[in-house]
Amino acid sequence: MNNGILHQNYNSKKFDIIKISLASPEVIRSWSHGEVKKPETINYRTFKPERDGLFCAKIFGPIKDYECLCGKYKRLKHRGVVCERCGVEVEQAKVRRERMGHIDLVCPVVHIWYLKSLPSRIGLFLDMPLKNVEKVLYFESYIVTDPGMTPLEKKQLLTDEEYAEALENYGYEFEASMGAEAIRDLLADTDIESEIELLQAECEESKSTAKKEKAIKRLRLLETFQASGNKPEWMVMTVLPVLPPDLRPLVPIEGGRFATSDLNDLYRRVINRNNRLKKLLDLNAPDIIVRNEKRMLQEAVDALLDNGRRGRAVTGSNKRPLKSLADMIKGKQGRFRQNLLGKRVDYSGRSVITVGPSLRLHECGLPKKMALELFKPFVYSKLRLGGHATTIKQAKRMVELEEAVVWDILETVINEHPVLLNRAPTLHRLGIQAFEPRLIEGKAIQLHPLVCAAFNADFDGDQMAVHVPLTVESQLEARVLMMSTNNILSPASGQPIITPTQDIVLGLYYITREKEGARGEGKLFSSYEDVSRAYNSGTIDIHAKIKLRIDRQVFDTKGNTYNEKGVVNTTVGRALLLNILPEGLSFSLLNKVLVKKEISKIINQAFRVLGGKATVVLADKLMYAGFKYSTLSGVSVGVDDMTIPDNKEAKIEEAEKEIKQITEQYQSSLITENERYNNIINIWSKTSDEVGASMMDAISKDTVSINGEKKEIESFNSVYMMAKSGARGSYNQMRQLAGMRGLMAKPDGTMIETAITANFREGLSVLQYFTSTHGARKGLADTALKTANAGYLTRRLVDVAQDLVVIEEDCGTDDGLMFSAIVEDGEVKVPLVERALGRTLAADVVTEKGVVLLEAGTLLDENLVELLDDNGIDMIKVRSPITCKTRRGLCAKCYGRDLARERQVNVGESVGVIAAQSIGEPGTQLTMRTFHTGGAASLGITVSDIKVKTAGKIKFKNIRTVTNKEGQEIVISRAGEIIVSDTMGRVREQHKIPMGAVVPLASGKAVEIGDVIATWDPHAQPLITDVAGKVVLEDVIDGITSKHTYDDLTGQQTIEITSISQRTTSKNLKPVVKIVDEKGAELKSIPLAVGAVLNVADDSILEVGDIVAKIPLEGSKNKDITGGLPRVAELFEARRPKDAAILSPCDGMVRLGNRDTKEKQRIEIIDKNGHIVEEILLPKSRHLVVFDGEQVSRGDVLADGPTDPHDLLKYKGLEEFADYILIEAQSVYRMQGVVINDKHIETIVRQMLRKAVILDEGDSKFVKDESIELVRILEENDKLRKQGKKEVEYELVLMGITRSSLSTESFLSAASFQETTRVLTEASINSQIDNLRGLKENVLIGRLIPAGTGLAVRKESAKIEKMREELGVEDNMVFTDLSSFNPEEISFDSIQSQKEDKDINEDIEESLRNALESLDF
């Protein structure tokens, strides 16, 4: 057990945290093994390194193992001797990878990261602008370091002339200098403590926010220096470390030249300039020359540390910028992403894949050649153990000669040794799966067809990589966790992912179809065997309708068993499939035409009822059957399969006639350009649909004569069968093949108004072909961009969620989210049953009668969600990752079911990464399009009423109505909804009702299907009065704020309000309609928005419910809706939209029109006592949706616009915000038909809410308005609560995924994500500590990740560590028995309490055994 999992990384030093901080000159010298004095590298004749040069063996160690440079000492026995001739220590050559050197710089040099990485730390520390610091550094001006008694100020800049003048005036009473020395002196002189006190005072007193912010920034920086133990002068270097030579190698290439790492060039420049400066100083050279040399030294060091950060990058001989130290670690090719987060591994190979239709689901075909190479070590050892070879050398020889015995041994070695197959890009965890290899001839890997969907593989030349798990533990994990048979369900949605596609579907569809009058119709068979015999002998046709006697046992999901007996009507093909159907599934699943959806249902049902193993067997059998019968069917595609409908020409002529009329109307100015375009588009899409429909009619029916009479039957047309079964192709593609191609889009998404009337069978004309290239090219360009964008989104998601792991069973919260069905456009898109499946209840579910149906804490499975449905429950509270109280992780209860395993999630599951993959993986399927509404492409018919689709009752929500003079109820509220619930009280429909709609029915009335519950004018939004009175128009001045328009056609005259930008003068006028009573007292004032058309004149009398003005909706409709991938990215990045909706920050009454400025309008919100609580300034062009004097609640919309998620969270709370993100993100995916479980989106949202802003610091050390990790605040509050002090008050802050990733607690994780330089600069100044909690940090340092099996091992290791501490045992001491335990050396008290005779080793082994058991295989 000694070399088991617990002893991984045996020789790596044990460490728990990594700290990064500034290095002092002493520290750099302590790393170093000697000073590099010369720029020489190696002697080009002897190829030996020059002494004191960049590759010096004396400093860095010998070139050959255990051999000094001059050759005096060779062999291991001299180890550790220092040769007196050449000064080289006899050691292993690999010390050249770890020994560092140093360069003593003649003058100090500023580290460019702390100067140029924004915000400039040196500039901020000294409170100087970066420009000034640079002037001093690069010797352009002097800086006063000590003014003495002179009137000069400290840190004042002086030009050469001013300096000379000052010297003349004050002599040597003051000190001023230039260069890094000056900066270093200033940094060292700063008294941090007194500066902090001054700044704190300034923060409290300062009135201006800008000053305050700057002071706070400086204060933070100074405090970090104070706390971290870093000295500010260390940002200026006096000693430069030199990288070990093997990390910047110099390799000879043919032709006597050398290829070298760029770093050597950069170091050479530094050494050259340093040495030259030393000489110049020794010679007492003129100041100007020394100054120039110092500047060049500074520039050389800058280039070495971060080339190109300042000025032009230093280039090599080939005009390419040299790669500096900073470039080595950042970017995709840098150390982090190239070598640490992903490495190339041994025991792997890659090859092209081909299809393996005869494999079983857990197998893959591995070419013999490849297998032999991959399993070589295993084969060698087997050859020796079997006595075929005595030495490894002999075994090697046998393998090279490929003797017969080698192949036999390879077979035994491979037996039950799983291999991993991986297809790039690996977008989700199903991109790597384990298979048992089967040896095959040839050179291509064979892949099982059913796993293609998971790998997204096809056989058009795709390649896959094979990896061999070596250790027993890794083989165990591959078999138990990664075997393809254990990955039947997709972790994103919980639906089967091994469902048959394409040929298989076609074959199954073909044999389950029925044909009228086929041979053997109407016969009765007693069993499957009979049918099979009859079919094989050719007496019955495969499509014949027959009767079959069955007698089966069927299980349902609840575990009940019942018998299925009797004679059923079926067809021969379906009866033949009966053999495949496992015991326990009903024959009714097969007794229908099997299209793709139905086959998916069978697999799903099998998994629910019979479990994984039976499902795998069933899937395999279905696949074999599907392939067999699709081959036998002979379905193929010919030109004649595409039937062109007879009435196509007539329909097109008709359309052209209509278009002619419309063009004439346009030419005689009866309709606008926009209307003309929309009408033409409408006509073409209608025609195109009609032609398509008649084509489908023609292709889907066949006329056959049965016994002399003609009968219409479903067609056996190949193209039709492929599309119908879901094997390949779609209605849309068929329409283009045989109907008409229809309208084509331009790259911006609008439609080209000339439709393509031809189809592919007839062929396109040149013009038609040209029209269609436009959109097609856009499609190809989009696809290329989309892949990159989707990959980047996935990377950001993974990075933000990587450290989220389930770490405990239950956090004990009763918080959660309210879930109900998702309703869009009045239709239930996702029923509650689907959303609730696999979630844990946060509160009891109570029926209408008050009976507790399900208790809180119940995990809802399929049977329980049905129970919810049966009892008509339409809203439940479920626990969610967003509200989980576990710190630095999640609890299993809040997450609920592991979708791929169908039971509660295991502790240790890395749910964050799974969530990120589930959201990112379908990214490539999402469009890049922004949708234009308004164009006919998505116009449809404008909705102007609501008809009910369910019988039941209606209920009003937030609706206020008034009755007008015709006795109609008019809606005067804005965000009203009508809810339709069925007889059981379940919500079936939800409709938003616009202002001004007429509602014929009262709340609570019963409705039947098809009843109209609301009507409105679709073209204009009316402004309605709820009081009666006389009209007074204010600020409605013709020619200034309004204009008369005269309609030629109807002869009507209207008054329309003009926009502010069109007015030349009087910009502060606000057109208003006031309604007054007889005495002239104002009852109501209605502000008029831009574009409003007045319905009333001055002094006219209004009744309740009358329309004052209408706002035409034409203009507002043509906004682009961002859709697809950009929308998902926008949501997760939490971007603030342009012109977002303004929400009310508090409850109160709205007061408008007070103290408006020239460009802005002011909204005031006043409380009950008339005090102003909040003020909001808005541009006058923004249209308000509230009236003067209206009561609003916190979070109500004051001005229309897209939702800003930040405001939503702030004013409406966590739940509303979570709901918004869930529904918005899901609607994008739903449009593409992608199913993603809500919990994945919630998991990411949790990571976006990691920070909180402090409202009241209480008795803590935090600063008000500071934003800090939520975990830190909660931990601080725990401490304060224990001590009985005042706790911190905070509110959650939303951060986009990129910002959230960069502001994690772990600097390693952030640095390996983006902006490496900035992250490392900040971390080192803070002396930041990385606790190595996340997955990424552990991958970086090469440890088991703290998730899955790694978490269990980690917990056990922690236990053992604790035991060892209690026993006072050294790390590396393992006792074989207690007798060797020397009580004199170790304090014996602690062990007395332990079982004295128990062997410690046994304890360790036992805890390891527990660890493996707790993995719950």
From Swiss-Prot:
SMART domains: RPOLA_N
Record key words, sorted: DNA-directed RNA polymerase, Magnesium, Metal-binding, Nucleotidyltransferase, Transcription, Transferase, Zinc
Cofactor (UniProt): Mg(2+); Zn(2+)
EC number: 2.7.7.6
Catalysed reactions, as listed in the record: RNA(n) + a ribonucleoside 5'-triphosphate = RNA(n+1) + diphosphate
Gene3D superfamilies in alphabetical order: 1.10.132.30, 1.10.150.390, 1.10.1790.20, 1.10.40.90, 2.40.40.20, 2.40.50.100, RNA polymerase II, clamp domain (4.10.860.120), RNA polymerase Rpb1, domain 3 (1.10.274.100)
GO terms under biological process: DNA-templated transcription
Keyword Cytoplasm attributed: no
InterPro entries found in the cross-reference section: DNA-dir_RpoC_beta_prime, DNA-dir_RpoC_beta_prime_bact, RNA_pol_asu, RNA_pol_N, RNA_pol_Rpb1_1, RNA_pol_Rpb1_3, RNA_pol_Rpb1_3_sf, RNA_pol_Rpb1_4
Binding positions (Mg(2+)): D458, D460, D462
Function: DNA-dependent RNA polymerase catalyzes the transcription of DNA into RNA using the four ribonucleoside triphosphates as substrates.
Assigned protein family: Belongs to the RNA polymerase beta' chain family.
Protein name according to UniProt: DNA-directed RNA polymerase subunit beta'
Organism of derivation: Francisella tularensis subsp. holarctica (strain LVS)
